[in-house]
């Protein structure tokens, strides 16, 4: 009798334990259930050609495309408040001894990177793909290359992207119904080499009175997660568009756009087809990219060195570290994206006070 009772209870007990032990995301409710909009051919062929030309011209200059850590220091903005007290002097050799600190541009201080929140989460969890490897390898995996630009008038082809009907339709499907006036403000080029990924993250949030022009981005992300400043939160929409001309990246190539709209162990995934795009409010929807060509080991990049990707012509690219060429790639080896963003406002009148947050401090 006891044996039969034990057998009868075994199956439901096993099912209960399995449900309790199943891996799941732990995302606050206010960061779930937001809209993501995907469209093939979101970028027209002519715009794609011009954007690829602009990208190569940028990557051919003396700066090239720095890693994302360096790009925040070199090509984005310098916040009024660079740190919250963690700054330490650089070592005699110019390095930062603490593994989580980086040099603050050309200054004599080491500070937390702008997105230490993203890096630390990835190192501790391995991201959606639960990667486990040495610290230096993980840092190299998420050190993609790019530039951040805020002056849209310098790039007519980007202005045309924002004005086009496809962006307008996608953006207005993401912005709240009560905030359908769009305010374009930023675009980025982001390139990944084989073995790299884009770690799970929120995009730099904007609040009335608190933006990346005033405070470190990791602090702004903390404000979003806390849900204590919602009355000052500025909704936005970003489009991740794909500029590589290779066929859609399949399961073997990886590099898909990943996002969480529910607390599930598995994120939703979208193929990175050429000239397609995904529109989402990345400042309140956690998103990432799968590892691009996961069978390839990403090049080891020392955080204390000047690492950048350069276009050298004839569809060839050089990865350099302190001027030394570490690797040569073909354009077909790279995952290429443009990310362009607009804020969502309720009326044209709301656009007036925005100027305070677009002035570099």
Task: Give a label for each model feature.
Residues 2-167, 332-337, 343-361:
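N-terminal auxiliary "cap/dimerization" subdomain that precedes the catalytic jelly-roll/cupin core
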Residues 40-42, 184-186, 195-197, 234-240, ...:
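Extracellular structured ligand-interaction cores
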Residues 42, 48-50, 70, 189, ...:
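Short, solvent-exposed loop/turn segments at secondary-structure junctions
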Residues 90-140, 201, 207-225, 296-325:
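Charged, glycine/proline-rich intrinsically disordered loops and linkers
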Residues 118-232:
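Signature of the catalytic double-stranded beta-helix
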Residues 180-181, 231-235, 249, 330-332:
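A short catalytic or substrate-binding loop motif that flags glycine-/basic-rich loops and adjacent residues
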Residues 225-235, 239, 243-245:
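Active-site region of the double-stranded beta-helix
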Residues 246-361:
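Catalytic core of Fe(II)/2-oxoglutarate
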């Amino acid at each position: 009798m006891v044996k039969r009772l034990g057998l009868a209870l075994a199956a439901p007990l096993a099912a209960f334990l399995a449900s309790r032990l199943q891996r799941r995301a732990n995302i606050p409710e206010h960061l779930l259930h937001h809209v993501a909009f995907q469209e093939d051919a979101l970028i027209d062929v002519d715009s794609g050609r011009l954007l690829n030309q602009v990208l190569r011209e940028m990557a051919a200059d003396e700066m090239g495309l720095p890693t994302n850590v360096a790009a925040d220091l070199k090509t984005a903005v310098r916040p009024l408040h660079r740190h919250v007290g963690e700054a330490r002097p650089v070592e005699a050799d110019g390095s930062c001894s603490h593994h989580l600190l980086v040099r603050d541009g050309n200054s004599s201080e080491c500070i937390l990177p702008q997105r230490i929140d993203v890096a630390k989460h990835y190192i501790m969890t391995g991201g959606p793909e639960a990667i486990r490897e040495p610290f230096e390898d993980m840092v190299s995996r998420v050190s993609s290359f790019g530039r951040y630009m805020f002056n849209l008038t310098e790039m007519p082809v980007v202005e045309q992207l924002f004005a086009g009907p496809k962006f307008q339709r996608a953006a207005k499907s993401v912005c709240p119904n009560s905030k359908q006036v769009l305010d374009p403000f930023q675009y980025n080029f982001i390139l990944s080499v084989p073995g790299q990924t884009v770690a799970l993250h929120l995009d730099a949030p904007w609040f009335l009175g608190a933006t990346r022009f005033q405070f470190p981005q990791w602090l702004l992300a903390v404000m979003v997660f806390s849900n204590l400043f919602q009355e000052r939160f500025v909704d936005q929409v970003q489009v991740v568009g794909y500029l590589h001309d290779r066929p859609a990246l399949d399961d073997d190539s990886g590099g898909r756009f990943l996002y969480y709209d529910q607390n599930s162990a598995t994120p939703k995934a979208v193929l990175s087809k050429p000239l397609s795009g995904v529109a989402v409010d990345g400042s309140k929807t956690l998103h990432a990219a799968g590892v691009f060509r996961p069978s390839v080991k990403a090049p080891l990049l020392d955080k204390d060195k000047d690492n950048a990707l350069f276009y050298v012509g004839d569809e060839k690219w050089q990865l350099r570290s302190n001027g030394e060429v570490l690797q040569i790639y073909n354009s077909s080896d790279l995952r290429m994206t443009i990310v362009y963003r607009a804020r969502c406002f309720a009326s044209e009148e709301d656009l007036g006070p925005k100027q305070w947050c677009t002035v570099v401090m």
